[in-house]
C-alpha cells in the first residue's frame, strides 16, 4: 500500500460543483448543531452523524450496532456507518444553494479576477451581484453590447421593445451566465493579436487580462466555477463544539457562519416555493451572497459579521492568515513532545560536549526508555508496572536511568534561535537540583548568560535521529561560526582575565639578572616555594633552546597541542581566539576541543588565584583633564564670538562646537588610558579588564574616568552641551538630565529594533530557503572579481580574507615566471591565499553564487567552502538558510548595542584637509583650477588629485649595475641594483620601476583623491610630498559654488520673498539669504557673473545660502553661494539596520540621484518642464540621438555645461537607486554595489560576514526578468518570469525556429521576491495568504516541493542534508541484518540467527 505521504507535488485548482459533490457525504439541511437535552448531534444538522460519521468509535447513533465486529455496517435505523470516530476529521458535507453566489476571493481581491475576465470593474461587479443593476447577456438588436450595465427602468423598456430576444440578468446568476459564455481560447488569441499590432501597450489591464485568460486556458479551470451553486461544509472536528463547565458551549466561529448560510438558504427556498414577490426574493438572495462572503472571508467585507461581544467572527480565510493562522501556527511551528525547559546555571566542570541534566527531568524525558529497560532486566513484569515504578521513583529506577542516559545525546535550544548554533546537541550528565548545567564556552553561540536565562531540551528518539544528532549537531562539531568561519567557542570574561594574568609579564628592573631553570618541574617547584612569581621574567631550557619567558606562559604552553610554536606574549581575548583558529586549521577539531577545555580550566583557576578586584580608587582620573576641558571651553567661546561677528553661520558654529568636544574627549581618553596603564605597574584591574577584552570597552572606561562627552537626542541629533564630568566625579543636575535621553533611547531602541531585526531575518529566510547545494559543478564560465577592501589608505580586508574559501575562476599565474601556479577551480585555503597575495595580486577572479547556473540551488564550485567546517560544501547543504541566518543574526545582536554605551554620541571628527600617510609623488591634478586673490589655486569644479606612493628614490649616477628596466614590476626584497660601493639595493615593497630625467624611483600604487569644489590645492604635479603633509584644504561643513571669472554678479530668477528667504539672526543681527522651494512659478534660480562679453551661469539649488548681492563685483575664486552639508547624526546600527532593510527591499531612495544613460557631453538647456531642469547629453557618436535628462530644480547639479560624462556617472546629488544602477550599469555593477553597501553597515559595527552569504541573497533578488518582447514564446509582455524558465522557453522556441523573447533583468526586494516564488505554499505561508492562493488556484499551479518550507508544511522530510533526494534510496542495515526502519513487531516474528542475537546487545 502506498503511504499517503509518498507524493512528489501538490496541485491547487478551482473545484467544480461536481467535485464538491464527490467530496461530500451528504447534504446539511438544518442549521442545528446538537440537541441541548441529549447533547447528541441533530440529524441533517451541522454535526450530523449520518453525514460526517459516528462520534463514538464502532457505534452507531441509535445504539443498534455496538462493537468493532460490525465494522463498515450501515445501520438501517439511523443510517450511520459503524466506524472510527476519526472519520469526523476528514468527511465533508455540502449545502445546495437555492441561488448561485459568487466567491468573494475572485471578485473582491485586487486585481479582481472575475472583473478581468468580464472586463468589468469591482464596483460594476458588485452592483450586479448585490442586485442594484442589470447586466446585458444578449443585447438582441438594442444596439447595446454584452456586459453593459442598465438600471431597472431601462431593462423593462428593452424587454417591452424586444421581447424574449433581449436577455439581461441580475445577481450571481447573470454573472455565471456571462462567465460560462466566455471562450477563453478565442479571447486570448484576440488580445495577443492586438498586442502584436500595437508596438507598445500602455494599458497594463490588457496584459493582466491576457494573463488571467491564459491561466484559465492552461489550467483547465472553467470561469463559471468562480460562482458557486454548492458550498462545501468542512468536517465537524475541524470546527469543534466543546462543553465548558457550567453547561455552556464553546463553538468555532465557522459554525455560526455556516448557520447563517443555511438559515438564509432555507428561507430563500421557502420564498421561492411560495412564489414570493421578486423584491423580497432579491433581498434574500443578496443576504445569502453576504452570508457566503462572510463564511469564506469575513475580514474582506466592509462591515464584518460580529459575534458575541462585538468581535468579528473568524472566517475560513482568517484561519489561514497571519502568525496565528494555520500555516505559521500549526504547520511551520509545532509543539514538540519529549521536551522540557529549565533555568541554566554554569557548569565549569563539564567537558565541551556535556551538559548537566537534572535527574527529575531525565526521569520524565527518558520515561519510555527506562520502562523498556526495566522490563528487559525483569525488574518489572510488564510496561504498566514499570510505569508505576518510574512514577514512584524506586531505587532501581535511578540505576537504570544512568544506563539509559549514557551516550544518548540530547538537544539544547535557547530562544530566540537566531542561527543554527542556537540548537546544539550534548551528552547528558545527571546532576542533582533542578537547573540545567551548561558549559561556559558554548554560551557565546547560544548568546546565553546565567542571569536567569532558560533553555529547552529535546530528546531525539529513533536510532536514526540519534545518529544524526551525534554526527552533525554535537557541540564539538560546531565550534566555528557559519557566518565567517571564526571560532565562536572562544573564552570570555573570567577565563580571559585568568589567561591574561597568567601570560602577562611584570616589569623587571633593567639589567637585573634573570633566574634560570632547566625544566618545567623546577619552575613549578620554584613557584610553590614562592621563589618566583607567575609573571616574573625567567630564562628556561625548553625544547632544546634557552627561552626568555615567564612561568605563567610556560604553564599556558603545556595545554597547546604538541608541535605548536611556543606562544610568548600576553594573551587577550583576540589573541586567544587567533590561537584557537590556528590550532583548528593545523590540527583539526578534535584537538581544538581538548585544548578548549584546558583553556577553560586554566582561565578559571588563575582568575581565582590572582583575584583581581575593583574599587573606586582604581578608576583614575587623568590630572591633565582640567586643562583640556579649559582649552575646549576657550575654543567654544571663540567659535561663539566668530558667529556673533557674522564670520560663520549658526550651523557652522554648531558643527565646530561638536567637533571641539569630540576632539577633546579623544584627548582626555588618551591621557586617561596612559594614566591607567602606569597605575599599579600596568596591573590596574579596570585597565586590565579592558585590555584583556574580558569586560568593558574604551568607550565605557572613558565614561568612568574621562568625560561622558556628547549625548544624542532621541532623534539622533547631537546635543552640543557636552557632559564634562565622568561617573567617578559624578554628574551635575543638568548633566544628569541630559543623560536621561540616552538611557531611555537605549531601552526603547532595544525593544523596537529587535522586532525589526527578527522580521528582516524572517524575510531573508523566506527568500533564500530553497537555495540548496544541488550539484558538484554547474560548468559556468562566469565569475566575479574580488580584491582588497580599503578605506582611504588602510586595508580593512586583505585579499586572503576576502577570497578565502572560494574556487578560482581563472588560472593564477606567477607574474615573474609566467607559470600557472594554481589552475582554474582550485579551492583557496589560507596557504593558497597567502601565496596569491605574495605574488603581488590585489584582486583575482573567483567563482560565486551570483554567477552560478545551477537550475535548482547552487553548485559546490560556485559556493565554495562551508564556513562552519572549512571544507568544501556538500550536496544537500541548506546554504540559503545559513546565509539568511548569518545576515539576520548580527542584526538582532547589534540593535542591542546602544543599550550598553548609554546613548553617548559618537561623531567623526571632520577632516579639513586631504593628506596621505606616506611619502608620495603627485602624478596629476584633474579638474579646473583658478588662482584667487590670495594667489591660491582653487578647484572651481569637482576634480581629483592623483598621488603615487614613493617607495625609494635614487639618482641614477648613484647606482651601478641596474637589474631592472623602466616600467618593470618588482616584488618586496627583489634586487634592483647595486651601489658603487657594492651594496645590494632591494625593493622595500612591491611596486613598479620608474626612471626619468636621471632619477630612479620605485613607485607603489596610485591613489585617486576626489576633491570638491572650492578646495585649495597646496601641491603641484611632480611634487614629492611628505607623510601627512596637507595636499589640499577644504571647508568640511559646506559645499560651495565658485566664480570662474572676474566680473559683476547678476541674480537670475532669484527674488527675495519668492524663492529667497531673508533670515535675520536675532542674537547677532546677521542677515542670511537662503534659497527655498517655490512651487507656483517656474523659476530657475541662477547666479550669473558677467565680464565684458563673457558670462558664466551657476545653478543655485534649494537650501543654498547666497554670499553675493545682485550687482556685486567678484574675483575669480570667490564664493558665490554655500550649501551646508547635513549635520552628522550618530552612526550606529540604528542607522544601519534600516539601511540593510532598505537595500534588501530594493526601495527607491527619496531623493535618488540621476545617472548618465550614455557617454557624452553635457548641454544645460535652461528649459524648465514640470518644475524640472532639462539637460541633454550629446553622445560622442554623431549617429546617436541626444539623451534628455530632467532634474528637480531644488537639487544641486554636479556637472557644468560642456563637461564630459561617462555612462553611469552621477549628474546631480542624492543617493543611488539600485534599480537605476541595474538599468544603466548592468547586473554586475548592481551585485557589487549591494554586497558592498550591506558589508559597509556591518563592518562599521565590527561584524564579520562572509561575502558569499550576502551574494546568495542578492542572487535570489535577481532571479526574475521582465519580458519586453514576447516573440513567439508563451509569455506576455511586462510579465515577470524566472530567469531559468525564460532561458528554457527561449531554447525551445529557437529549436522550433521561432523568434525568442527579449527581457531585461529586474531587481525584486525581499518581500516581493518571496511572494513571487515558484512555490505557492512557501509564498502563502509568508504574507498575503489569500491573494497567493487565489492566484495559484486560477493558474492551476503545481508545487513541486523543492524548497524547505513547502516540505515542512506538508510534513515531509526537508530536501536538504540527509533528506536530499540523492540520499533517499540508501537503506541502513544493522550488522548486515534487519532494516533499521522496519517496525519491531516484524523483527520479532522472524527467527533471528543465534550468532546475531548474541552480539546485538541492545544497541538499538
Swiss-Prot record:
Where, by residue number, does Mg(2+) bind?
449, 451, 453
Mind listing the UniProt keywords for this protein, alphabetically?
DNA-directed RNA polymerase, Magnesium, Metal-binding, Nucleotidyltransferase, Transcription, Transferase, Zinc
Task: Share an example GO biological-process annotation for this protein.
Answer: DNA-templated transcription
Q: What class of enzyme is it?
A: transferase
Q: Where is the composition biased (Acidic residues)?
A: 1384-1404
EC number annotated for this UniProt entry: 2.7.7.6
| A GO term, aspect molecular function | zinc ion binding
Pfam families hit by this protein: RNA_pol_Rpb1_1 (PF04997), RNA_pol_Rpb1_2 (PF00623), RNA_pol_Rpb1_3 (PF04983), RNA_pol_Rpb1_4 (PF05000), RNA_pol_Rpb1_5 (PF04998)
The cofactor remark states: Binds 1 Mg(2+) ion per subunit.
Q: Name one GO cellular component term.
A: DNA-directed RNA polymerase complex
Q: Function, please?
A: DNA-dependent RNA polymerase catalyzes the transcription of DNA into RNA using the four ribonucleoside triphosphates as substrates.
Name the family: Belongs to the RNA polymerase beta' chain family.
The annotated subunit structure for this chain is: The RNAP catalytic core consists of 2 alpha, 1 beta, 1 beta' and 1 omega subunit. When a sigma factor is associated with the core the holoenzyme is formed, which can initiate transcription.
Q: Could you tell me what this protein is called?
A: DNA-directed RNA polymerase subunit beta'
- Name the encoding gene, please: rpoC
